[in-house]
């Protein structure tokens, strides 16, 4: 298991935000200080600090993806027509692991990544084991037949913690879903406020 997955709830504590809105988050148990810090006082962040925090929240939300992958997506967002921050959100939501999470085939982005890595997920009927794979509008995402009875998948599908967004369609009986359209920032059901505009400011310094 990677260090990124082992530390998923440490991300919540470090950023002071319950990124995925989960009841298991340490923030729901009063552990609000970053790991290793015991004092209650926090300095007001500088503009740089605020921008950095916005970037870390967005990276952390999508499974603490690497800086290299995140920067590559940002650079592509810049090259595309339209608003860079909206483009960035759209590209993040097109990642296969993000789509698997949104369809409620997994309880967290980390678990979604593991399902993809371990070949439990199909795209248009073909096995794909690359979490960063770019899903296109109209693509059908499904759980492999032999994996449909996995407890982790069934529990995620039945969970009432979150809903499937309207830019996707899903049939949990068949464990199959469709990526209908690329969302805008306002469409994405983040549990906390995301500020991709500050991410743009961070990289534009």
Swiss-Prot record:
Transmembrane segments: none annotated. SUPFAM superfamilies: Alpha-L RNA-binding motif. GO terms for biological process: ribosomal small subunit biogenesis; translation. One of its GO terms (molecular function) is rRNA binding. It comes from the Bacteria. Keywords: Ribonucleoprotein, Ribosomal protein, RNA-binding, rRNA-binding. Residues 20-47 are annotated as: Disordered. PROSITE patterns: RIBOSOMAL_S4 (PS00632), S4 (PS50889). Coiled coil: none annotated. Belongs to the universal ribosomal protein uS4 family. Part of the 30S ribosomal subunit. Contacts protein S5. The interaction surface between S4 and S5 is involved in control of translational fidelity. One of the primary rRNA binding proteins, it binds directly to 16S rRNA where it nucleates assembly of the body of the 30S subunit. This is Small ribosomal subunit protein uS4. The gene is rpsD.
């Amino acid at each position: 298991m990677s260090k990124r997955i082992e530390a998923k709830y440490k991300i919540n504590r470090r950023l002071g935000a319950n990124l995925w809105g989960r009841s298991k988050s340490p923030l729901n148990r009063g552990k609000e200080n970053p790991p290793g810090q015991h004092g209650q006082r926090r300095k007001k962040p500088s503009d740089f600090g605020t921008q950095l925090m916005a970037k870390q929240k967005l990276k952390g939300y999508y499974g603490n993806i690497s800086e290299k992958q995140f920067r590559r997506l940002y650079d592509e967002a810049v090259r595309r027509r339209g608003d860079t921050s909206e483009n960035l959100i759209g590209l993040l939501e097109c990642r296969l692991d993000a789509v698997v999470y949104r369809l409620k085939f997994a309880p967290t982005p980390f678990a979604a990544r593991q399902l993809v890595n371990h070949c439990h997920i199909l795209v248009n009927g073909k096995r794909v084991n690359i979490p960063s794979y770019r899903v296109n509008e109209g693509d059908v995402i499904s759980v492999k037949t032999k994996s449909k009875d996995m407890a982790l998948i069934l529990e995620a599908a039945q969970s009432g913690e979150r809903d499937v967004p309207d830019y996707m369609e899903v049939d949990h009986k068949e464990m199959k879903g469709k990526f209908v359209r690329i969302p805008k920032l306002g469409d994405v059901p983040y549990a906390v406020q995301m500020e991709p505009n500050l991410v743009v400011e961070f990289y534009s310094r």
